[in-house]
């Protein structure tokens, strides 16, 4: 017997209701109460990084990576909402896809990933 998927991602928040609203409005991620977020977009990576990684801020223990269909469209929407978005062509590759990074209102790092076709 083995694990066959992620059952949930749980994290602390100063204002859980405001954070749920932010994720819903800006990323389309809906998580309310104990109703699971249904996704059918593909596999999920689970990967530990070294404690000295500079892939995300060192004052945070984790970073969420969300798969997106149209990175340019979402980046435009986020910037229109005055959300700082960082992109770097060095992060992108034809084999893996394209990336952008943002932070939620509580400073949690979020990576947005448009997989390669």
Q: Can you describe what each PLM-predicted range is?
A:
Residues 10-12, 65-67:
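Short hydrophobic/aromatic beta-strand micro-patches
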Residues 1-5, 11, 32, 75-117:
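Vicinal oxygen chelate
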Residues 5-7, 60-64:
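Short amphipathic alpha-helical segments
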Residues 18-19, 63, 99:
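Secondary-structure boundary/capping motif
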């Amino acid at each position: 017997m083995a694990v066959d998927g992620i059952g949930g991602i749980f994290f602390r928040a100063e204002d859980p209701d405001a954070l749920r609203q932010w994720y819903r409005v800006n990323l389309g991620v809906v998580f309310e109460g104990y109703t699971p977020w249904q996704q059918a977009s593909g596999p999920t990576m689970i990967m530990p990084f070294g404690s000295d990684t500079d892939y995300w801020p060192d004052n945070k223990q984790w970073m969420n990576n969300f798969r997106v269909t149209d990175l340019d469209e979402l980046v435009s929407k986020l910037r229109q909402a005055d959300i700082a978005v960082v992109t770097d062509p060095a992060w992108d590759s034809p084999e893996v896809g394209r990336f952008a990074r943002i932070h939620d209102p509580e400073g949690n790092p979020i990576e947005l990933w448009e997989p390669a076709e």
